[in-house]
Amino acid sequence: FLPLCHVYERSVNYHFQYKGMGIYYVGNLSQIVSAIKEIKPHMFNSVPRLLEKVHDGFVTKGKELTGIKKSLYFWALNLTQHFEYNKKYGPLLSLKIKIADKLIYSKWREALGGNIVYVVSGGAALQPRIARVLGMAKMLNLEGCGLTETSPVIAVNNPAKKEMKIGTVGPILEGYEVKIAEDGEILCKGPGVMKGYYKAPEMTAEVIDSEGWFHTGDIGILDEGKYLKITDRKKEIFKLSGGKYIAPQMIENKLKASELIEQVMVIGANEKFASALISPNFPLLHDWCAEHKVHYENNIELIQLPQVVEKIQNEVNLVNKTLGSHEQISRIRLVCEEWTPATGELSPTLKLRRNV
């Protein structure tokens, strides 16, 4: 369902064909869940935003339950945060996981066709909590990274070699070299790296240096000296008027861990402090309002209600406690529209467009 003009989708499709796998295409994002139930795939390509939607669906399902069923459901959901790749659990935790799998996780697999073994994820960083939910439900997330200029994948979590780590995009692929520049930028060499942009030597010189290293534009580290972890985009980092730098993507990912925050953009270049534009998760926010007897006529009125603003602000405050003093969000503004590729705030692969 991702655009075939996108090198990520195209290259993975080539790999599927090489392995003799059948490929099914879904033309409408709204039909994905029903198509998965019908096709019953063993794996599918995705982007983090869609997997966040899947996770939100699991949470919504639990909230529809009552009594002991609801308690068991969220006990099982919370249990997923113990998941780590290639980890041996103790006897008590193993028993809990076995019970949760029979009662809850098996239902999640069934909701996604019942056959999924792997979910390929790329295009942006996936929140670790979502990777753990999928992993505990026996749907391992193969998160990787790359660019069109690198053909595209340079690193990916590899279950065949048991080289997987949550929160990273996995080990570097064989044949590639990666190093971290002094400013934190990820540089790479390898057979898949382009020779240059077509008839654009000046543009090529901006990204390939004299030693042949391609500058990816991503900021990251090598965790344990082996697993690549991307923390932000170099061009998206901005400076406050006081001289401190802000890496917005890291803050945005933390904020989106709240079930009430659908999308967020951290801003504040050349300002005294960082602020955030927030598109709420309106279905869940509507549920919260119904539960707390908060009345409104439409979303425009909803986002202006003091109790709603306070609720979202409390979610932001929790994240602020984990940030440095200069990184903390000092002001928020709620918007009444859902951000989509059609409205222009998101790209076709559901990444945030900051220059809208």
What are these regions (language model features)?
Residues 126, 134-140, 147-166, 200-203, ...:
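Active-site loops of AMP-binding adenylate-forming
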Residues 4-105, 115:
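Conserved AMP-binding/adenylation subdomain of ANL enzymes
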Residues 193, 227-256, 285-306, 325-329, ...:
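Adenylate-forming
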Residues 171-240, 257:
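Conserved ATP-binding/catalytic segment of the ANL
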Residues 219, 224, 258-283:
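C-terminal boundary motif of the adenylate-forming
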Residues 6-8, 49, 123-130, 143-160, ...:
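Conserved A3 ("GATE") glycine/threonine-rich loop of ANL adenylate-forming enzymes
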Residues 95, 162, 166, 193-217, ...:
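Conserved ANL (AMP-binding/adenylate-forming) active-site segment centered on the GW(Y/F)…HTG consensus within
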Residues 263-267, 313-356:
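Conserved C-terminal "lid"/linker of ANL adenylate-forming enzymes
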